[in-house]
């Protein structure tokens, strides 16, 4: 499993310590950018991305929960982003243009699905994605309850990838923790975005929190059984 800590959940008073630790242990940094319109919250910014970039060597994945993603792509490229992750709900009528713009800036393309958005919504450009993320909670806030129906969506993405010979990673955003790791792996997840319940709330010390998380993931991995689709 790959791990992508969500920086909206980190302790900003320990910014340097936690960024440096995550950089030496994780696979990605997950950075949520919200505009207060697409979701009812405001979080991180292109400036924040630029500050993380000063300390980070691992890829910075910027999740755009904004109504106008086209306004952020060039800013985030300048700030040092490596991935731009887009919601199909916000790119209708400009999906191909925005994906091409991300590529022109030498960044990778992520697509992310809200719980109620079907995989079919990105049928005509799914092959252009480097990573596809499934929201397993309603977007906008940390610490929300897991939506079990999303396990079928993960299994659908895995089957689509195999059927079409695609190579995108399958990522999960929302309530990735001890209670869900086994089910998520069984359904086809490759990457966990970990936040409050999965990482940062385990201990004051990031080193100890990471140790606890890793032990939980390894224990879940040993119990994984194939996911059975629900009716």
Swiss-Prot record:
Its EC number is 5.1.3.-. The active site is at residues 32, 173. The keyword Mitochondrion does not apply. InterPro entries: Aldolase_TIM, AlluloseP_3_epimer_AlsE, Ribul_P_3_epim-like, RibuloseP-bd_barrel. Its cofactor is Co(2+); Mn(2+); Zn(2+). Pathway: Carbohydrate degradation; D-allose degradation. It comes from the Bacteria. SUPFAM superfamilies: Ribulose-phoshate binding barrel. Substrate binds at residues 6, 63, 140-143, 173-175, 195-197. Signal peptide: none annotated. GO terms for biological process: carbohydrate metabolic process; D-allose catabolic process; pentose-phosphate shunt, non-oxidative branch. Binds 1 divalent metal cation per subunit. Activity is highest with Co(2+) > Mn(2+) > Zn(2+). One of its GO terms (cellular component) is cytosol. Homohexamer. Trimer of dimers. This is D-allulose-6-phosphate 3-epimerase. It comes from Escherichia coli (strain K12).
